[in-house]
């Protein structure tokens, strides 16, 4: 089978990420009935029909004292579009996560690439483990944009040339950079998401400092907003207890 490339593909450039909550079974009540089975047994099923606001103290207790398993009885599935380098960091998170990503073996990859906008700090100051990022100069911003776009264009032209010559997609993709956009489904529960947020976002309420790469933090912020809407009491307890996963 010969792979047929698209006609005269023109690269496009983005600086954003997108996150869509595609399905969920997640509520604060899920935490409560799971926790209360310890003392109520089958009577804990009654919690499924009660207003969880009555028991927000229990949720806070579980979070504070790090009784984590009740926070696992829920599920959220997100559809995420981001550069490949974001997904390579993302998939370091293995416990409580499931992933399926767009395949460069089975489809022709689209010519959409990441170029940071002016809000992205470009210069790292300090030493490993103790550093900050600061604004780049106008010249640095222009350099990054020009060099990235030139590099992406050359790489994608090489990819297309190989496809046109009949080279398999799984071979031709080797020339493509990690700034290429990919897409994936990621499924987690509240406990695994809290662990992710504790490491991949910065927040003034966090007891433990974190130094995430900005692009994965952008993904985390969007996932956090969706989760906060689904499980507001759990989310409030997470923040009240230093954003440390139980």
Predicted feature locations:
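Family-specific signature for flavin-dependent thymidylate synthase
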Residues: 1-246
């Amino acid at each position: 089978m010969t792979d047929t490339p698209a006609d005269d593909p023109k690269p496009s450039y983005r600086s954003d990420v997108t996150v869509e909550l595609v399905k969920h079974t997640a509520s604060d009540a899920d935490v409560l009935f799971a926790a209360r089975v310890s003392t109520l047994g089958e009577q804990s099923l009654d919690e499924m029909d009660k207003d969880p606001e009555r028991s927000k103290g229990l949720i806070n207790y579980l979070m504070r004292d790090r009784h984590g398993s009740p926070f696992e009885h829920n599920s959220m599935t997100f559809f995420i579009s981001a550069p490949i380098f974001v997904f390579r960091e993302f998939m370091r998170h293995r416990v409580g996560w499931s992933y399926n990503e767009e395949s460069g073996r089975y489809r022709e990859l689209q010519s959409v690439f990441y170029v940071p906008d002016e809000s992205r700090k470009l210069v790292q100051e300090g030493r490993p483990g103790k550093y900050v990022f600061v604004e780049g100069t106008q010249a640095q911003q222009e350099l990054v944009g020009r060099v990235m776009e030139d590099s992406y264009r050359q790489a994608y032209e090489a990819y297309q040339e190989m496809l046109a010559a009949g080279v398999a997609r799984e071979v031709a993709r080797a020339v493509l950079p990690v700034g290429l956009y990919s897409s994936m489904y990621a499924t987690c529960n509240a406990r695994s998401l809290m662990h992710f947020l504790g490491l991949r976002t910065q927040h003034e309420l966090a007891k433990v400092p974190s130094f995430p790469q900005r692009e994965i933090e952008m993904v985390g912020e969007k996932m956090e907003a969706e989760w906060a809407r689904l499980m507001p009491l759990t989310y409030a307890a997470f923040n009240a207890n230093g954003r440390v996963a139980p």
